[in-house]
Amino acid sequence: VRRMIANKLGDESPFQAPLALNVVPWAGSVKDDGWSSEELKVRNESRKILGIPDLKVSATCVRVPVVTTHSLAVHAVFERDIDVDAARQALIEAPSVVVIDEPGEGEFPTPVDVVGSDPTFVGRIRQALDFPNTLELFVCGDNLRKGAALNTAQIAELVAAEVSGGSSDS
């Protein structure tokens, strides 16, 4: 522990920087133009799962000192203005999604809360201040049970279906 806190990595570490008491803005291997393999994976898997080959996705993967779970800060841009209440309701009604969204009461999903759980947890649901067509939300899920890209895609699909007035089969 002292070695970790002193920011010394042993020769056996697979990480580029110490993880203990740290946040590292890198996950995966180096790819073109400064992207990591994990960031490209989020983009490619989201496109594949949604069946939208030209879906615009940009992700920055960050390693944080948690045992398990993936968390995402999602910035979803839509063609039309978003109704936050309708988006929240769509998420509440979605199978395998649990909404915990009372930040004023200290209620929002965290990795500690979701370990060992099957559902995807969503909170901090809000409209971007300067962009009425943009929804901001925080997503957590146990990645040993369900992958991050699938979670992101399913949530985006549900919100998109609600915004367009359609329904989702997910």
Task: Give residue ranges: language-model regions.
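Active-site-lining helix/loop region of Rossmann-like oxidoreductase modules
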Residues: V1-A90
